[in-house]
């Protein structure tokens, strides 16, 4: 499923040296920082990528004791964190392992990563005929924080619950209730489980508002779902702001680390297709750096800039 976001994550995660390489010995600026005591685990390409180690050094002034080549947000990275071979690991920010393993996702407080915030993409004619759709979907988005998205993913992919069950429980817990809708819409998704889960949340909220909803999930890649949106085969899609923008603009490089600016540019690019993007969520699915709770507690880590503080 991860390849669905490879266009955005390729810029954020693409490759470096295949073996572990020492990164901490030469920089006097990094001596004595928390990072200089720790090993980073990530994909082999991480050291040379602007949204991975290169960016951590340039944006945060972080140099690690060592780098351990593992995988792109997968089980090898998770294992390295759990067995102590690494203390910091690159995962995706909504990876269910974060909730399942109790990892601490370090806040990207200097906005290193491109803004892949969750955002609904909707046909404009559907919104014009049913204003409650915008109200309801933006209501969902307002509640969708990072912890909520990660937990939804965990419940489906780790705990084995049905997406419909998980969506219904979350909607009830958040008190999401709307009315005044009519007619019918179709909610679609790519073949990525997370987009299907969010799509199910969208569908149930709209049904609660009085709208008949058809679900067309697991349609395929963006090369399938965007033509489906434009043709009217589907009306609503949960997307990622930066990734969606770079898809519709043919990789023009307009996405930035600013979610508001990226979302505005996405709306601009969608306008001539009869589509628009609604509000963006606080929740993202992009590169993220995690530590175990024990490491976070030991060093007082909550955000990436904490790694540049003097070691205790």
Residue ranges with predicted function:
Residues 30-78, 161-165, 184-215, 219, ...:
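Bilobed "Venus flytrap"/periplasmic-binding protein-like clamshell domains
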Residues 45-51, 116, 131, 135-185, ...:
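An extracytoplasmic/periplasmic, membrane-proximal ligand-sensing/linker region
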Residues 226-283:
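N-terminal segment of the mature folded domain
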Residues 1-10:
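Bacterial N-terminal signal peptides that target proteins for export
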Residues 28-38, 123-128, 135-147, 260-312:
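A conserved helix-loop-strand patch within extracytoplasmic ligand-binding domains
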Residues 79-105, 238-253, 262-266:
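A ligand-binding cleft/hinge motif common to bilobed small-molecule-binding domains
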Residues 22-25:
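Bacterial signal peptide processing site
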């Amino acid at each position: 499923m991860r390849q669905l976001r490879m266009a955005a994550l390729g810029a954020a995660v693409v490759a470096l040296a295949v073996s572990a390489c020492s990164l901490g010995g030469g920089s006097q600026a990094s001596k004595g920082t928390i990072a200089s005591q720790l090993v980073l685990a990530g994909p082999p390409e991480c050291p040379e990528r602007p949204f991975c180690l290169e960016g951590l050094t340039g944006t945060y002034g972080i140099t690690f004791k060592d780098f351990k080549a593992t995988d792109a947000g997968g089980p090898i990275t998770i294992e390295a964190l759990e067995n102590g071979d690494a203390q910091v690991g690159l995962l995706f920010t909504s990876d269910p392992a974060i909730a399942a393993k109790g990892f601490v996702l370090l806040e990207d407080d200097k906005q290193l990563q491109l803004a892949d915030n969750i955002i609904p993409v909707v046909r404009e004619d559907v919104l014009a005929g049913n204003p409650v759709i915008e109200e309801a979907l933006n209501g969902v988005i307002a509640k969708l924080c990072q912890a909520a998205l990660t937990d939804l993913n965990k419940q489906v992919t780790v705990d084995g619950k049905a997406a419909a069950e998980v969506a219904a429980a979350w909607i009830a817990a958040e008190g999401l209730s709307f009315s005044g809708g009519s007619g019918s819409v179709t909610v679609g998704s790519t073949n990525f489980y997370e987009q299907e889960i969010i799509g199910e949340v969208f569908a149930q909220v709209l049904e609660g508002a009085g709208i008949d909803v058809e679900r067309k999930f697991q349609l395929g890649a963006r090369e399938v779902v965007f033509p489906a949106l434009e043709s009217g085969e589907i009306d609503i899609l949960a997307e990622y702001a930066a990734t969606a923008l770079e898809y519709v603009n043919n990789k023009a490089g307009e996405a930035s680390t600013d979610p508001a600016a990226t979302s505005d540019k996405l709306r601009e690019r969608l306008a001539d297709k009869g589509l628009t993007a609604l509000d963006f969520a606080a929740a993202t699915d992009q590169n993220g750096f995690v530590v175990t709770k024990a490491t976070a507690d030991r060093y007082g880590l909550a955000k990436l800039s904490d790694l540049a503080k003097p070691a205790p």
